[in-house]
Amino acid sequence: MSNLPPDEKVILFDKSKHVQYIVEQESHRSFEYWLSEHLRMNGLYWGVTALITMNELSALAQQDVIDYIMLCWDDKTGAFGSFPKHDGHILSTLSALQVLKIYDQELTVLNDNNESSNGNKRERLIKFITGLQLPDGSFQGDKYGEVDTRFVYTAVSSLSLLNALTDSIADTASAFIMQCFNFDGGFGLIPGSESHAAQVFTCVGALAIMNKLDLLDVENKKVKLIDWLTERQVLPSGGFNGRPEKLPDVCYSWWVLSSLSILKRKNWVDLKILENFILTCQDLENGGFSDRPGNQTDVYHTCFAIAGLSLIDYKKYGFKEIDPVYCMPVEVTSKFVRRSA
């Protein structure tokens, strides 16, 4: 039974405002725009994902998006950077691949052999990603050596999109992930670090891609994990937090609910009050979503608010169904090969 008060005002979803907001963000040239160069490729993915989920992908010019992504190719590393002339990184590489997959399932733009004597871009991307895996199964984000479970998910997802995920990579990567499982039922960045909802998604999502979810069946790990996830719902607001004793944040509508969806336990939380919390985070005047009601909007929270609504009831909003493993529409991910021998 929902905890939504009977006199709660019904809040409508204003799609046109959010489409306008995203388009403006993707073409913005403010001071804040230049301060966030390091997130530009991620921001493009957030905007494109929100638009395609709302069935409004045509709001951005497809060729302009693809041209920008290819400007971010770093020929030195064989990967994508977050901005033209930035070094390649695993995070921006996944975002680039996700957007390219949305527009071109076959990734034909990566098959050009003319620009580099070192092979085509697809081959070089696979070499870059696989070269970041360490002996313990973890992945670095780039050559500078930072390691955490985000990069495991990012690498595994990228290789899946490239149809290059092998058993040898999956076996060691999944072993590292399970080392990051905590006594409280969550996952952390590295072994022994604090449990966090976003890290739970990266670990559960990676295990799903690698067909390794059965590793959670040992020693009641799945039961503990589901309990930890359901405890993230904060009353009376209905939103999720990322850790115990923290405020709810609309982005966890994705990180928590996607993990529960992968584990087939989405209905173990109150979806009605969660939906209401998400809708209260809208800026109904200018569009976009914020982390909490009344705060400043941004494209990151907008993307994951819309993705959360799709998980709750995509038909109600006229959205595309979203894949909880990849955070992309099912119509795109249904053709992915999650693991190859």
UniProtKB/Swiss-Prot annotation:
EC code: 2.5.1.60
Presence of keyword tRNA processing: no
Gene Ontology CC annotations of this record: Rab-protein geranylgeranyltransferase complex
Any one GO BP annotation for this protein: protein geranylgeranylation
Role noted for this protein: Catalyzes the transfer of a geranyl-geranyl moiety from geranyl-geranyl pyrophosphate to proteins having the C-terminal -XCC or -XCXC, where both cysteines may become modified. Acts on YPT1 and SEC4.
Amino-acid positions noted as binding Zn(2+) in the UniProt annotation, renumbered to this chain: 249, 251, 301
Family: Belongs to the protein prenyltransferase subunit beta family.
PFTB repeats: 15-55, 62-104, 122-163, 170-211, 223-264, 271-313
InterPro entries xrefs: PGGT1B-like (IPR045089), Prenyltrans (IPR001330), Ptb1 (IPR026873), Terpenoid_cyclase/PrenylTrfase (IPR008930)
Assembly information from the UniProt record: Heterodimer of an alpha and a beta subunit.
UniProt xrefs under CDD domains: GGTase-II (cd02894)
Cofactors named for this entry: Zn(2+)
Catalytic activity, as annotated: geranylgeranyl diphosphate + L-cysteinyl-[protein] = S-geranylgeranyl-L-cysteinyl-[protein] + diphosphate
SUPFAM superfamilies listed in its UniProt record: Terpenoid cyclases/Protein prenyltransferases (SSF48239)
UniProt-recorded name of the protein: Geranylgeranyl transferase type-2 subunit beta
Binding residues annotated for geranylgeranyl diphosphate, in chain numbering: 196-198, 243-255
One Pfam family here: Prenyltrans
Gene name for this UniProt entry: BET2
